[in-house]
């Protein structure tokens, strides 16, 4: 099978599942959902599967997708010591989250230089890669929603309704603003600290909260919503070539 084929990337994150269809190098569509989007005219020749979920949850999703596309070839992606000219910094490479690994690979190939990779989703994950493709390591911190939920779950009287979350100028003057803007400032301070450590590196950002941070960070960023899927395509194609 040529790698220039119809590919479905299944990216099972902590809170959502993202399905990305490729025709060659072109992204045809991207869908999010809890189950496989079988109601499409797209028939993948190969499926690249990447999951950060538990073994049990991953197995259920695997069965769901395989039932929808029984004739498709299947490659489960895992973090490796090296892939696509990128070297994993982890002593135990397989313990680096597959979403982080695929983001690192994609960012290196997109930027071809020193780059900081930020995935702002359920967690805020930051990885640093140099121009030679060496992954230098990274960080994992709570995402914006996780910080808010943690604060609310551990306090009795910090409460607000979603309609109370409005933008304002100056210091927050309501509980809703105090919590939401406080969590934003925590995330921004974390990212600004990393920028201080790597001021000459380019920045690539992805994830559901990417735009919210992008607008307030004051750092030149490039946003790639499909970064993990692009990395999956690169790594999957390399493995597919190796299997033939």
Curated annotation (Swiss-Prot):
This is Type III pantothenate kinase. Its EC number is 2.7.1.33. K(+) binds at residue 119. Gene3D superfamilies: 3.30.420.40. Homodimer. The active site is at residue 99. ATP binds at residues 11-18, 122. GO terms for biological process: coenzyme A biosynthetic process. Its cofactor is NH4(+); K(+). It comes from Marinomonas sp. (strain MWYL1). Keywords: ATP-binding, Coenzyme A biosynthesis, Cytoplasm, Kinase, Metal-binding, Nucleotide-binding, Potassium, Transferase. It comes from the Bacteria. One of its GO terms (cellular component) is cytoplasm. It is found in: Cytoplasm.
